[in-house]
Design a protein with these regions (language model features):
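S-adenosyl-L-methionine-dependent methyltransferase catalytic core, i.e., the SAM/SAH-binding region
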Residues: 1-303
Length: 303
């Protein structure tokens, strides 16, 4: 499959998310989800000669979209390691951080990666093809209870236990290594009127577990909170309730759990103030890019 920066991933809420950073021409910014480079290019277009942008992506395929600009540094790494990498580049404080947490269209459309149930493909689902266990490893090695927990916690599937049992029954006959074999094992449990949505939730749960997405998000947001200077902006786009809850909690309370701390006078103590109400794509953007429909943009400023 031939992929260009334009087809790799169409940037969602492009203007709104970059506007939210309130770009300072000489500032230092981080795009933690480089992908096709759409958001990064927009940030660079607003930076002056002394500004700099660090962009993260753990997928080797994203390197094909690297920008040729002295003000740009590409970091091939999971964004959870932002603190370590900023230390490596001797960056003490940043002026803003942007994250588009959606899975790139490239991943859904690549038949070899196993991110979509539209194709019969190996069950991989790793964002970084060099690291960690695959979705097939999880399906064939996790206990029935572990699988049920993954499907319930990360897919919010009400029949998680029945799905886990069906998978374990199937793997006693043969290993589950392809998307087609997974579909064959669980299709009888998918509600006909919601089959696509339930399958999407199942795939979401597996992808989150494979890539440790929730832990990585918590680590990244903690690092961002430490790195942002006073007045620095956090601009994050989420696509499902699990990641949105974490982002909302961090912006409101300063921690992923949403535990509100108060000062001596009973005032809520948080490192952020909300800059905007939640922003969603316009009807026009949703029509142009249907994958933007569930996107939510939240913007906060370090105080």
């Amino acid at each position: 499959m031939i992929t260009t920066a334009e087809t790799y991933h169409v940037p969602v809420l492009l203007k709104e998310s970059v506007d939210g950073l309130d770009i300072q021409p000489d500032g230092i910014y981080v795009d933690v989800t480089f992908g096709g480079g759409g958001h990064s290019k927009e940030i660079l277009s607003r930076l002056g000669k002394k500004g700099h942008l660090y962009s993260f992506d753990q997928d080797a395929d994203a390197e094909k979209n690297i920008v040729d600009d002295d003000r740009f540094t590409f970091v091939r790494s999971n964004f959870r390691y932002i603190s370590q990498w900023m230390r490596y580049y001797e960056v003490e404080k940043i002026d803003g951080l942007l994250g588009d947490l959606g899975v790139s269209s490239h991943h859904f459309d690549d038949e070899t990666r196993g991110f979509s149930f539209r194709f019969d493909a190996p069950l991989d689902m790793r964002m970084n093809k060099r690291a960690g266990q695959t979705a097939a490893d999880i399906l064939n090695n996790y206990s029935e209870e572990q699988l049920a927990d993954v499907f319930y916690l990360y897919g919010e599937l009400k029949n998680a236990r029945r799905i886990a049992k069906a998978i374990c029954d199937c793997r006693r006959q043969h290993e589950i290594t392809t998307t087609g074999q997974l579909a064959e094992a669980v299709e009888p449990l998918m509600r006909s009127e919601r089959e696509k949505k339930d399958m999407a939730k199942l795939y979401q749960a597996l992808r989150i577990e494979v890539n440790h997405e929730m832990d990585a998000l918590r680590d990244m947001l903690k690092g961002a909170t430490d790195l942002l200077r006073e007045g620095g902006r956090l601009s994050i786009i989420t696509y499902h309730s699990l990641e949105d809850r974490i982002v909302k909690n961090v912006m409101k309370a300063g921690n992923a759990e949403g535990k509100v701390e108060q000062d001596f006078y009973g005032r809520i103590s948080s490192p952020y103030r909300l800059v905007e109400k939640m922003i969603t794509p316009t009807e026009d953007e949703q029509q142009r890019n249907p994958r933007s429909r569930s996107a939510k943009l939240r913007i906060a400023e370090k105080i």
